[in-house]
Amino acid sequence: MDGIKYAVFTDKSIRLLGKNQYTSNVESGSTRTEIKHWVELFFGVKVIAMNSHRLPGKGRRMGPIMGQTMHYRRMIITLQPGYSIPPLRKKRT
């Protein structure tokens, strides 16, 4: 399982960094428990809470045919005080 796809940097997610909460998009079929264990093992941190929501796909037009992109899941991970995750940066091309 890949776990986290990439970190999300929006106005809200940057504001949540001050509360030791990290926002990222994760695999759509993964559960909270899987992501929690993956984050704790990979980053060596203690997770105290996780909030998740599924964002809908967007409509995309391909000529006369209207298509739909895949939905995705976003997790807000709250860590215990004293722990932090280095920023997950997406490679710019």
Swiss-Prot record:
Pfam families: Ribosomal_L23. GO terms for biological process: translation. Disulfide bonds: none annotated. It is found in: Plastid, Chloroplast. Part of the 50S ribosomal subunit. Belongs to the universal ribosomal protein uL23 family. This is Large ribosomal subunit protein uL23cz/uL23cy. It comes from Daucus carota.
